[in-house]
């Protein structure tokens, strides 16, 4: 179990309060699909993913990105029980969707990049460390069913 300090929780919550879930979520998922094109195989039903502009403008990518980032909002509310919080999603991604666990970390890294882009002044090394810890912990929680 990952332990978050009071300072880390406060840092994550303070930035989260400013996040536009639709924008950051959509950009994060789009970056994942562009930078790591093999991840597109998990999104066959999303239609046209043949180019960067098609991915960035795809409404299904944006909608699913928002959904993914909303789950991070849930994680922030339950930072002391991420495995429990993500148990159902872990089962879904393992048993039905067959998503390879390393992809969770890749998406977490995309979220960090987009947050740094949108909040450059506030995304200090300390803020990055807190968010990196959270994205890694969420990735581990999502991969829990695989073990």
Curated annotation (Swiss-Prot):
Tissue expression notes: Red blood cells.
Residue ranges of domain Globin in the record: 3-147
Recorded GO MF terms: haptoglobin binding; heme binding; hemoglobin alpha binding; metal ion binding; organic acid binding; oxygen binding; oxygen carrier activity; peroxidase activity
GO cellular component, one term: haptoglobin-hemoglobin complex
InterPro entries attached to this UniProt entry: Globin, Globin-like_sf, Globin/Proto, Hemoglobin_b, Hemoglobin_oxygen_transport
Gene Ontology terms describing biological process: hydrogen peroxide catabolic process
Binding, heme b: 64, 93
Keyword annotations of the record: Heme, Iron, Metal-binding, Oxygen transport, Transport
Protein task: Beta-type chain found in early embryos.
Matches recorded under PANTHER family: HEMOGLOBIN FAMILY MEMBER, HEMOGLOBIN SUBUNIT EPSILON-2
Similarity remark: Belongs to the globin family.
Subunit organization: Heterotetramer of two epsilon chains and two alpha chains.
Protein's UniProt name: Hemoglobin subunit epsilon-2
